[in-house]
Every structure is written in structure tokens, then in C-alpha cells.
Swiss-Prot record:
It is found in: Cell membrane. This is A-type ATP synthase subunit A. ATP binds at G228, P229, F230, G231, S232, G233, K234, T235. Its EC number is 7.1.2.2. Belongs to the ATPase alpha/beta chains family. Pfam families: ATP-synt_ab, ATP-synt_ab_N, ATP-synt_ab_Xtn, ATP-synt_VA_C. PROSITE patterns: ATPASE_ALPHA_BETA. One of its GO terms (biological process) is proton motive force-driven plasma membrane ATP synthesis. Has multiple subunits with at least A(3), B(3), C, D, E, F, H, I and proteolipid K(x). One of its GO terms (cellular component) is proton-transporting two-sector ATPase complex, catalytic domain. Component of the A-type ATP synthase that produces ATP from ADP in the presence of a proton gradient across the membrane. The A chain is the catalytic subunit. The gene is atpA. Keywords: ATP synthesis, ATP-binding, Cell membrane, Hydrogen ion transport, Ion transport, Membrane, Nucleotide-binding, Translocase, Transport.
Length: 578
């Protein structure tokens, strides 16, 4: 007979129940409507539950049932191109059942249990298999071959394996001990999926954004944070990363952000082409939409749901990038739940375990050798929304302690319409040194020295700007006036990028290198001309400088760049010939 509890108290999304036999993090059905909730605290006879749906109308005395299992996600063919809410309910299914607004107590399977997939076995009868071993494949999209793996906690010898078209819940393989395997497996979201070993990240995540790839690269399997005030471009940067990063799978979590931003993603991604494969971007994307008007408790679930789906694809040997926009909203949800539980508040009202929860999430990133011997990676990029752009607040500070790349968005840059508004003086990447060999081998041997020179120049420019604001640029020596012009070119030509331009939105490494080298070449030639006696105003009149600024928008980039370099050589030769 099913044991049921009784609601004792309701406080927003937190419900206290008596008489319920449940374990920590068990999934429960709350009230007459059967709202989905999760056990977060057990105090003697009382069980405290956070409810993932609106609790209006629930009253003391209503029943509460434990499912006996923790919050889990369904993993298998059909994940790609899906759009879920925070607890892996497909939004298109909820739309059919309840209309434009999500009804309460509605349950839906994470994967389509009726759709047929063609299963091709790679294991055979008599094979000994263990957790993580691949027993077959399904061609899920044109480019992604979905590997069907044995769940991590199962092992045995195959007594029967089938081939053909099956649903995700059909038995496709039977072990000698009677265990039946399906294409789908369930996994608790709070439990990291096991791996054989973790590895050191050695390859960069190519984002197509010059300031990120060039100055502050993140490694595949790395962690990065994008903190910034409102309107500084966090979401556009995150969306650009989701569109153009060179990973095979993208998991995008809209955690507590505006509904319109998720609507933008939903309308844009199906129409955009993946630059690596030429296929629609949606084919490699899983979207988790948990907007600001959805119940706060589900924000935590959405983050864990997203990282668990990412781990599943990593186990197949794929490179995954996960965008969480924004982790601050998740932290605010934790603060609200914590205050409802009447826990002792920490700094600025956040719970004392804030840093532990953030670390728990970011540490699930990394490069790993999976149980089946494949090497995959998860790169986690979390947006942080500090109120008023104050980077000293707890969420930003705790995130900074964990992540190795910090892309600091600056309100002043965004007000000057400099996008991406990443402040090159405040940002840093701790992966730079470990990726230098990759850049030297795959881009150009002189790429790293060029980058270091550019950073030194930008640093010097910031020091000179203080003098310029006091006495004006005319008071500076000629070489420093010229340096200011070179750094202006670096800022406007190399660092600035238009995320909505058909050509400039994505800049390949070869293109980035040529633009940077051309600016440095112009700067070196200008300094040489200055030493030979040419006045600064004459150098600044050269047309090649203006033409170079337009090259990044040209579809025939190499032709245009070659023409500019030829023009540059001619102009400087004529200057020296005077």
C-alpha cells in the first residue's frame, strides 16, 4: 500500500509535510493536483519539499505521495533539437496539452516513447559488457551518430541483441541474468555520471569571436564566466557562443532570464547554419527554457538537468559546450528557498552553501576518458548578472574562485557601442600558457608573440589615456601619438565584432591571425616612417588604414586582405621615398 503524507504548511514554493516516508532528494507528488516536488530537508517527522510548480491553492491537509526515486532525466535518441522546461518536460507537448501557459500537475516524458529509431548493434550475443560499453548506434541526425551505451551501474553477458526499428522503451538487448536494456536510460540529475579518468584540457574552444579566441581563450573542457551589468551583452555573447563554437553538441540553459530571449533563440537557431557542417544549428542543440516567470525552484533543476544531458553526450566521446544564462538567477532561487527554510543567511542573504553548490556545478565540466574509452569534453560557460555591475558581490566572487576564464563585460564599453563589451584590462584566461603550443602548431608560430605585443600595447594605451584626458593627445611625443592610433585600430578592427553581421559574426582563426598581423605590420611600418622623419599627420592620412578597417566585412576575405597589404606596402614606400 502506498504511504502518503499530509501537507502541514505551505510557504511559497516550500511545502512542509508530515507522515511521509521519503529519502533526501526523492521526487514527490504534492497536493490533489499532484504537483512535482523534491525533498530538500527532513526534520524528524516533518519532510520539507521544494515544489517545481506554482503552489497557489494548495492547503494543509491535502495528500502528498513519494515516488521513491530521485529527480532523473531520460537520456537517449531524441534529445537533440528538443526544447524542455527545467524538469525535462518537452514544451511542445505541454503546449498541446495545456495551451500557451503551462498548466499545473502536467507530466510529460522527456523523450518521445512512440517514435521509432533504427538501431544497429555493434555488440553480439555472448559478448561481455560493462557500464559505459557501446552496444549499438542510432543515426539521430545527419552528423550525429548516437551511441547506445550500457548504463554505468550494469554489467553482464549478452544473451540476445536485436536489430531494426524500435522505440526508446523497447527492449533491444537482454543479459544472461535477465536484465533488459533499452535505448533510453534514466539518470539522477544531482549525481555526476562516472568517468574512467579526467584529463588536462589541451585544445581551445574556437568561438569565432576575435577577443575571446585571440586574447582570452577557453580550453575545451574548461570553465568560463561572463559577468556583467544589465544591457552589457551577456545574452548576445552567450548566444554567439552557442551558435558558432566548434563543439558537436550545445546545451543552452535559459535559467531565470527573459522569455523573449529564449523566443529569440527558438526563432533564430532553426534558420542558422552550423559553420562546421552546413546543417541547421538546432540539429546539435538542446534547449532548456526556464524563464523568469516560471517557479523559482525549477531554476536549480534546470541547471542540473542541463549538465546531466551534457555528461551523457560527453560519455559518447563528443565535445559539448554548456551555456548557463544566468547562474545569478539560480543563486537568487537558492537564496529564496533558503530564507523560506529559515536558514542562517550568509553574505548578502545568500545561503552559506552558495560556493559549494556553484563548485559542484562547475566541477562537472572537464575533459574525460569515458567508461567506453572515448575522450569527450564539457565546456561550461556561465553568465553572472551582478546587480549594478558590482563584481564584489558573492555570486561573482565565488564563481571567480572556481572558473579559469573571466570575460568581464563593461557597461562603459557597451555605452560607447563597443561590442563585444569585454574589458581587455580586467579579463583573463588561465588556459593561455597550456594552449600556446596548439596555437603555434595550428595557427602560426608567431601568433602568441603577436598576441602578447597587442596586449602590451593596449595596457600602455590605458596608461596614456589618463594623460590624454588631462592635457590632450597633442602634448604626447610623436611615437606615443602613433601608438594611440595603432591601439585604436586594434580596438576597432580586431576587438570589435558585429554579432548580427552575416560575415563578421564568425571569424575563423586564419582570418583573426591575418587581421592582427596586418594591424601590427601597419604599426611597425608607421613607426619606421616616423623614425625616418615623416610627420605623424602624414602617416595618419594613409588610405590603407581605412581600407583595412573594412576587410573583416568582406566575403572574399583573402583577396581583400592581399589587396590591402599591397596598398600598404606602396603607400609606405612612397612616404619613405619623399
Amino acid at each position: 500500500m502506498e504511504v502518503k503524507g499530509e501537507i502541514y504548511r505551505v510557504s511559497g514554493p516550500v511545502v512542509t509535510v508530515t507522515g511521509l516516508q521519503a529519502k533526501m532528494y526523492d521526487l514527490v507528488k504534492v497536493g490533489d493536483e499532484g504537483l512535482m516536488g523534491e525533498v530538500i530537508q527532513i526534520l524528524g517527522p516533518k519532510t520539507i519539499i521544494q515544489v517545481y510548480e506554482e503552489t497557489a491553492g494548495i492547503k494543509p491537509g491535502e495528500p502528498c505521495y513519494s515516488t521513491g526515486s530521485s529527480l532523473s532525466v531520460e537520456l537517449g535518441p531524441g534529445l537533440l533539437s528538443s526544447i524542455y522546461d527545467g524538469v525535462q518536460r518537452p514544451l511542445h507537448v505541454l503546449l498541446e496539452r495545456t495551451g500557451g501557459f503551462i498548466g499545473r500537475g502536467v507530466t510529460a516524458d522527456g523523450l518521445d516513447h512512440k517514435k521509432l529509431w533504427e538501431f544497429k548493434p555493434v555488440a553480439k550475443k555472448g559478448d561481455s559488457v560493462k557500464g559505459g560499453d557501446v552496444i549499438g548506434v542510432v543515426q539521430e541526425t545527419v552528423n550525429i551518430e548516437h551511441k547506445i551505451m550500457v548504463p554505468p551501474d550494469i554489467s553482464g553477458t549478452i544473451s540476445d541483441i536485436k536489430s531494426g526499428n524500435f522505440t526508446v522503451v523497447d527492449t533491444i538487448c537482454t543479459l544472461t541474468d535477465g536484465t533488459e536494456l533499452q535505448m533510453m536510460q534514466k539518470w539522477p540529475v544531482r549525481r555526476p555520471r562516472p568517468v574512467r579518468t579526467k584529463l588536462t584540457p589541451t585544445r581551445p574552444l574556437v568561438t569565432g569571436m576575435r577577443i575571446l579566441d585571440g586574447l582570452f581563450p577557453v580550453a575545451k573542457g574548461g570553465t568560463a564566466a561572463i559577468p556583467g551589468p544589465f544591457g552589457s551583452g551577456k545574452t548576445v555573447t552567450q548566444q554567439s557562443l552557442a551558435k558558432w563554437s566548434d563543439t558537436e553538441i550545445v546545451v543552452y540553459i535559459g535559467c531565470g532570464e527573459r522569455g523573449n530571449e529564449m523566443a529569440d533563440v527558438l526563432s533564430e537557431f532553426p534558420e542558422l547554419e552550423d559553420p562546421q557542417t552546413g546543417r541547421p544549428l538546432m540539429e546539435r542543440t538542446v534547449l532548456i527554457a526556464n524563464t523568469s516567470n516560471m517557479p523559482v525552484a525549477a531554476r536549480e533543476a534546470s541547471v542540473y538537468t542541463g549538465i546531466t544531458i551534457a555528461e551523457y553526450f560527453r560519455d559518447m566521446g563528443l565535445d559539448v559546450s554548456l551555456m548557463a544564462d544566468s547562474t545569478s538567477r539560480w543563486a537568487e532561487a537558492m537564496r529564496e528557498i533558503s530564507s523560506r527554510l529559515e536558514e542562517m543567511p550568509g553574505e548578502e542573504g545568500y545561503p552559506a552553501y552558495l560556493s559549494a553548490r556553484l563548485a559542484e556545478f562547475y566541477e562537472r565540466a572537464g575533459v574525460a576518458e569515458s567508461l567506453c574509452g572515448e575522450t569527450g569534453s564539457i565546456t561550461v560557460i556561465g553568465a553572472v548578472s551582478p546587480p549594478g555591475g558590482d563584481f564584489s558581490e558573492p555570486v561573482t566572487q565565488n564563481t571567480l574562485r572556481i572558473v579559469k576564464v573571466f570575460w568581464a563585460l563593461d557597461a562603459k564599453l557597451s555605452q560607447r557601442r563597443h561590442f563585444p563589451a569585454i574589458n581587455w584590462l580586467n579579463s583573463y584566461s588561465l588556459y593561455k600558457d597550456s594552449l600556446n603550443d596548439w596555437f603555434a602548431d595550428n595557427v602560426a608560430p608567431d601568433y602568441v608573440p603577436l598576441r602578447e605585443r597587442a596586449m602590451e600595447m593596449l595596457q600602455t594605451e590605458s596608461e596614456l589615456q589618463e594623460i590624454v584626458q588631462l592635457v590632450g593627445s597633442d602634448a604626447l611625443p610623436d611615437d606615443q601619438q602613433l601608438l594611440l592610433e595603432i591601439t585604436r585600430m586594434l580596438r576597432e578592427i580586431f576587438l570589435q565584432q558585429n554579432a548580427f553581421h552575416p560575415v563578421d559574426a564568425y571569424s575563423p582563426f586564419a582570418q583573426q591571425y591575418r587581421i592582427l598581423k596586418a594591424i601590427m605590420k601597419w604599426g611597425d611600418a608607421a613607426m619606421e616612417a616616423l623614425k625616418s622623419g615623416v610627420p605623424v599627420p602624414e602617416i595618419l592620412k594613409l588610405e590603407s588604414k581605412n581600407v583595412l578597417a573594412k576587410v573583416k566585412y568582406e566575403e572574399k576575405f583573402d583577396e581583400s586582405m592581399n589587396a590591402v597589404l599591397t596598398q600598404m606596402d606602396k603607400e609606405f614606400a612612397s612616404l619613405r621615398g619623399r
